[in-house]
Swiss-Prot record:
The active site is at H93 (electrophile), E141 (proton acceptor). SUPFAM superfamilies: Triosephosphate isomerase (TIM). CDD domains: TIM. Involved in the gluconeogenesis. Catalyzes stereospecifically the conversion of dihydroxyacetone phosphate (DHAP) to D-glyceraldehyde-3-phosphate (G3P). The keyword Hydrolase does not apply. The gene is tpiA. This is Triosephosphate isomerase. One of its GO terms (molecular function) is triose-phosphate isomerase activity. Keywords: Cytoplasm, Gluconeogenesis, Glycolysis, Isomerase. Transmembrane segments: none annotated. It is found in: Cytoplasm. Substrate binds at N9, L10, K11, I146, G181, A202, S203.
Length: 222
C-alpha cells in the first residue's frame, strides 16, 4: 500500500453506533480527502451496508465466521459481509479470538470472495504464523495495551519491529499494521518509521469529542 492506512474499529461502543457512527465515517472521509491517507472504519455489522454505500472510505467487518451458507443461526457469513458492501474484514481480534484452523478458513473464504483480510496477532511469533496464511494485513496488537491509553509505539516499539521482520521473513507481500493505545500523530509516525503501513485503533477516535480533529492529528506527521 502506497498511502498510510488508518483503520478505526468502532467495536460496540455506544459512541460508535447509529448517528455517532455516521459522524465518525464522515470525519474519516473528510480527513482522507484532505490528507491522502487511507482511512477505513470497522463498524457494527448492522452498519456495514449504510457505511459502505454512503461514504467513500473502505469499510471492514469486525469479524467473520468460518462457515458456508446454510444452517448457522447467529453466525457471521462471509458472503453476507461481501453482499453488504464491505471491502474486507478483521479476523482474530483479541476480543474475538479464533483457532489457527478457523483463522486459515476465514482467510480462504475471504480471499474467494475478494474481501481484504486483517488478521490480528499479539506477538511476533503469532505474526509470523499469520503471515503464512497470506492475508492482506497482519495487525500486531499487544492485548495488555488495547484501550489502555498507553501507545504500543512508545511502550514497546520492539514488538513492532520484530513483528515486521517476522512477517517479511515469511511473506514480504503481507502488509503490517500495529495497534493498541494509538492516540496521536507521533504514535502513527513511529509505527510507520518502524516499517508498518499504518495503524488499527479504536477508542482514541470513537470516544473523542471531536473525531475529525483526532483523525487529522493522527495523519499530520505522515
Amino acid at each position: 500500500m502506497d498511502s498510510p492506512f488508518v483503520l478505526v474499529n468502532l467495536k460496540t461502543y455506544q459512541e460508535g453506533m447509529g448517528s455517532n457512527a455516521h459522524r465518525i465515517a464522515a470525519a474519516a472521509e473528510t480527513v482522507a480527502k484532505e490528507s491522502g491517507a487511507v482511512i477505513g472504519i470497522a463498524p457494527a455489522f448492522t452498519e456495514l451496508h449504510p457505511m459502505s454505500h454512503h461514504y467513500a472510505i473502505p469499510v471492514y467487518a469486525q469479524h467473520i465466521d468460518a462457515i458456508t451458507p446454510g444452517a448457522h443461526t447467529g453466525h457471521i457469513l462471509p458472503e453476507a459481509v461481501r453482499s453488504a458492501g464491505a471491502r474486507g474484514t478483521l479476523i482474530n481480534h483479541s476480543e474475538r479470538r479464533l483457532t489457527l484452523a478457523d483463522i486459515g478458513a476465514c482467510v480462504e473464504s475471504a480471499r474467494r470472495l475478494h474481501l481484504e483480510t486483517v488478521v490480528c496477532t499479539n506477538n511476533d511469533a503469532t505474526s509470523a504464523a499469520a503471515a503464512a496464511l497470506r492475508p492482506d494485513y497482519v495487525a500486531i496488537e499487544p492485548p495488555e495495551l488495547i484501550g489502555s491509553g498507553v501507545s504500543v509505539s512508545k511502550a514497546d516499539p520492539g514488538i513492532i519491529e520484530r513483528s515486521v521482520n517476522a512477517v517479511r521473513a515469511v511473506n514480504p507481500d503481507v502488509n503490517v499494521l500495529t495497534g493498541a493505545g494509538i492516540q496521536s500523530g507521533e504514535c502513527v509516525k513511529i509505527a510507520v518509521d518502524l516499517g508498518t503501513c499504518g495503524v488499527l485503533l479504536a477508542s482514541s477516535v470513537v470516544k473523542a469529542d471531536d473525531p475529525e480533529a483526532v483523525l487529522r492529528d493522527l495523519v499530520s506527521l505522515l
